[in-house]
């Protein structure tokens, strides 16, 4: 992997407002280096898909004053979980964010709820959060946020796509919990033990 500073020089647009580091595998170390770079203070659009960035890396980015002008953050296909998304939802440095792509990360309900309830992300209009681990509670929180606030373009997985139901009347009488219970059941059925 090339150094992050070299990649910035190669891929930062001449107006210094857009940086596309897609598929560069910069990881957390590279994300931390990026967050400290003096070259990106005017950046508005940051594209970091498929870079193996986890919570540590995204937390460094969203807590950097260098990203105070950021309006578009594309971090799909990384390994960002709820902690990273909560940092996004709580960071005052990225309060100008209008578009956020979290497609294909490790976000669960808590992360989705953090975005839905965020007071800081008041300008967010486009959210791409499909192909994560978000279930009913998170999806409903996001859909409710869309109805009452700013999310004009929300892309989440459909609830109908999930085929899970908690069966409250599940009869576990057939479950065997110990070796002794198995032997006793076999004896009741007249089956012999070898």
Residue ranges: model-predicted function:
Residues 1-46:
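N-terminal segments that cap or nucleate solenoid repeat domains
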Residues 14, 38-41, 65-68, 92-95, ...:
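Inter-repeat linker/turn residues at the boundaries of leucine-rich repeats
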Residues 2-4, 24-32, 52-59, 79-86, ...:
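Short, solvent-exposed loop/turn at the beta-strand->alpha-helix junction
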Residues 49, 56-66, 72-94, 101:
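Alpha-helical adaptor scaffolds
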